[in-house]
């Protein structure tokens, strides 16, 4: 009857916590690390946001002596003030790996998933879609934000900041070519369009009227109202005459 965000975060954390402990026991020489002790968040606008500075410091301390194999439960974190269990959102395990890789200045970040990497389109819709071998950080971020669910979007920033390449490989097809995400691709002008992605079940709202023309702060009021209600905008289009603004 009582499912508060705090209770929910605690319940959903058990999957990663238990599975990582089990895998640790199966791998010789492996050591388990509790990510709640070094992945720290703070509450802003009713959301748990990573405290990057504190987290980086704690990660470096936790991994000052790295064992042969380190197992870390992804996705879960803890509030830096209360110590309560929090999480990094759906897909947060990728984000956990990126945070640790960036803090430790890793040579690369490998993400093993169930697809061969980024595709030129959704293969369930376009049968001729094929794997994109190279993407820049910006290109990958755009594809992720618009529906390509290969990598959790926040994953890219920590490693991009440190110029650490991300290698996407398929667990069920380890010999597949995969996708490498890095600062600069080998031939950036090879294709004007790298890939096509789409988002289902989204809303597009247009605010229009001649009374908007030349009026300062209209968009500010729109975005303020959305932010107040915890709504994030991923698409904005405005007419040059300023008489309409479309948001998605």
Where would I find each of the regions flagged by the language model?
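Short, glycine-/Ser/Thr-/acidic-enriched flexible segments
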Residues: 76-77, 93, 105, 116-117, ...
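Active-site C-terminal subdomain of aminotransferase-like
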Residues: 162-177, 200
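Nucleotide/pyrophosphate-binding catalytic subdomain
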Residues: 1-156
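A conserved regulatory-domain signal marking ACT and ACT-like small-molecule sensing domains
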Residues: 177-248
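Generic beta-strand/beta-sheet core signal
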Residues: 33, 72-74, 112, 153, ...
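A broad, low-specificity signal marking well-ordered, structured residues that form hydrophobic/aromatic
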Residues: 30, 70, 86, 166, ...
């Amino acid at each position: 009857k009582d499912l508060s965000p705090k209770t929910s975060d605690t319940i959903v954390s058990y999957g990663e916590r238990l599975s990582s402990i089990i895998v640790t026991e199966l791998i010789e020489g492996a050591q388990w690390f509790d990510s709640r002790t070094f992945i720290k968040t703070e509450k802003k606008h009713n959301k748990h946001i990573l405290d990057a500075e504190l987290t980086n410091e704690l990660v470096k301390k936790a991994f000052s002596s790295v064992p042969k194999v380190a197992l870390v439960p992804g996705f879960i974190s803890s509030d830096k003030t209360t110590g309560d269990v929090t999480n990094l959102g759906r897909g947060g395990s990728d984000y956990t790996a990126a945070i640790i890789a960036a803090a430790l200045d890793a040579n690369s970040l490998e993400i093993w998933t169930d697809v061969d990497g980024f595709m030129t389109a959704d293969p369930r819709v376009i049968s001729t879609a094929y794997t994109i071998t190279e993407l820049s950080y910006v290109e990958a971020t755009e594809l992720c934000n618009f529906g390509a669910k290969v990598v959790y979007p926040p994953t890219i920033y920590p490693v991009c900041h440190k110029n650490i390449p991300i290698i996407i490989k398929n667990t069920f097809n380890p010999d597949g070519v995969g996708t490498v995400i890095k600062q600069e691709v080998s031939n950036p002008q090879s294709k004007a369009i790298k890939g096509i992605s789409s988002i289902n079940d989204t809303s597009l709202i247009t605010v229009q009227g001649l009374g908007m023309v030349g009026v300062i702060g209209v968009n500010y009021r729109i975005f303020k109202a959305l932010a107040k209600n915890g709504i994030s905008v991923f698409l904005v289009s405005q007419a040059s005459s300023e008489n309409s603004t479309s948001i998605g």
